[in-house]
UniProtKB/Swiss-Prot annotation:
Reaction(s) this enzyme catalyzes, per UniProt: Strict requirement for an Asp residue at position P1 and with a marked preference for His at position P2. It has a preferred cleavage sequence of Leu-Gly-His-Asp-|-Xaa
Transmembrane stretches, start-end: none
Pfam families the record matches: CARD (PF00619), Peptidase_C14 (PF00656)
Regulation (activators, inhibitors): Inhibited by the effector protein NleF that is produced by pathogenic E.coli; this inhibits apoptosis. Inhibited by BIRC6; following inhibition of BIRC6-caspase binding by DIABLO/SMAC, BIRC6 is subjected to caspase cleavage, leading to an increase in active caspases.
Residues annotated as domain CARD: 1-92
The keyword Hydrolase is annotated on this UniProt entry: yes
The species this protein was found in: Homo sapiens
Gene3D superfamilies: 3.40.50.1460, Death Domain, Fas
Protein name, per record: Caspase-9
(Microbial infection) ADP-riboxanated arginine modification, residue list: 355
Length: 416
């Protein structure tokens, strides 16, 4: 598949994953020899086996099926009555071709004799590179920014860093916390995603609060001198907690909380000197409280406004005053002015975070989709803005991801 078709598929992936009816496609894909039977079986087993996971894997694998893969896929859509998607892809493909001039369409310009003679060249006034938008049409400008150590973190090592995923699913009965069905789907998606971004991924499941802290300390005490970055992902129930800088807390399987502030503080310059000056990224999929956001009315025809196929569950637990002393004492002890830290929350403080038992959490599912499509060309903050926009329009109840950004530079993931 050529690069233009590949870019088109990535731009359209969110809509395809939302609308593609994969069950109708298998025979058509086989008859047009786009895929072989064992490939179809692999796609059907992708993720949780849900329609969305199958659709996502199909689009990813389609990129590897040759130069005619996209037009053949469009024909398969037409064969199975999915005319709107077929027309959408065909129109966008034609528009992309028309917007790119070819040599045969260019008219030669004949220079007048008087201007063929070289003139004295005048120095051009330097023009600043626009780095504010996050997206870059000029590949050269993007690569120049990636390689500028004054403007962007340089992730050049292989692997570029450690990634620890703590996935708490089953909680003790005394905690009163429900099993987080669907979290294993989130965990697997993130394991694959950060592996593809050149991280060494380690997964630890069902940890008590004490074991969570020990796992984090163990990671912080490793030598990160030859690495460029560090990622911590926590999938658990959560609650509000008093704080100085980073709100919220996450629960161990014993029902005891660990404040996000404590987690971040484990990786500060004093506790983890080998990560000094390097980006430390934290992704928290847990509730920030117990409020359910009904949103407010806006005029919209977006398909994402419809609620998911199954009832989502919150990762919510009410605010506990008993956490106040715990968090306050910990925060006062030695938390320095934060730098090179980025904390991404699945929801706005005080509100619940929704998780679908069959397809995983809204936040992780969207994060995975956005990283797949845009991580090669956009920086971390731009990616998370896309995630926030996509998650905010889902479901009957609303959810608004957010972040605390103490990075000093732009961060582009290593994708090749």
């Amino acid at each position: 598949m050529d690069e233009a078709d590949r870019r088109l598929l990535r731009r359209c992936r969110l809509r395809l994953v939302e609308e593609l009816q994969v069950d109708q496609l298998w025979d058509a894909l086989l008859s047009r020899e786009l895929f072989r039977p064992h490939m179809i079986e692999d796609i059907q087993r992708a993720g949780s086996g849900s329609r969305r996971d199958q659709a996502r894997q199909l689009i990813i694998d389609l990129e590897t099926r040759g130069s005619q893969a996209l037009p053949l896929f469009i024909s398969c859509l037409e064969d199975t009555g999915q005319d709107m998607l077929a027309s959408f892809l065909r129109t966008n493909r034609q528009a992309a071709k028309l917007s790119k001039p070819t040599l045969e369409n260019l008219t030669p310009v004949v220079l007048r004799p008087e201007i063929r003679k070289p003139e004295v060249l005048r120095p051009e006034t330097p023009r600043p590179v626009d780095i504010g938008s996050g997206g870059f049409g000029d590949v050269g400008a993007l690569e120049s920014l990636r390689g500028n150590a004054d403007l962007a973190y340089i992730l050049s090592m292989e692997p570029c860093g450690h990634c620890l995923i703590i996935n708490n699913v089953n909680f003790c009965r005394e905690s009163g916390l429900r099993t987080r069905t669907g979290s294993n789907i989130d965990c697997e998606k993130l394991r694959r995603r950060f592996s593809s971004l050149h991280f060494m991924v380690e997964v630890k499941g069902d940890l008590t609060a004490k074991k969570m802290v020990l796992a984090l300390l163990e990671l912080a005490q490793q030598d990160h001198g030859a690495l460029d970055c560090c990622v911590v992902v926590i999938l658990s129930h959560g609650c509000q907690a008093s704080h100085l800088q980073f709100p919220g807390a996450v629960y161990g399987t014993d029902g005891c909380p660990v404040s996000v502030e404590k987690i971040v503080n484990i990786f500060n310059g004093t506790s983890c000197p080998s990560l000094g000056g390097k980006p430390k990224l934290f992704f928290i999929q847990a509730c920030g409280g117990e409020q359910k956001d009904h949103g407010f009315e806006v005029a919209s025809t977006s398909p994402e406004d419809e609620s998911p196929g199954s009832n989502p569950e919150p990762d919510a637990t009410p605010f506990q005053e008993g956490l106040r002393t715990f968090d306050q004492l910990d925060a006062i002890s030695s938390l320095p002015t934060p730098s090179d830290i980025f904390v991404s929350y699945s929801t706005f403080p005080g509100f619940v975070s929704w998780r679908d038992p069959k397809s995983g959490s809204w936040y992780v599912e969207t994060l995975d989709d956005i990283f797949e499509q845009w991580a090669h060309s956009e920086d971390l903050q731009s990616l998370l803005l896309r995630v926030a926009n996509a998650v905010s329009v889902k479901g009957i109840y609303k959810q608004m991801p957010g972040c605390f950004n103490f990075l000093r530079k732009k961060l582009f993931f290593k994708t090749s």
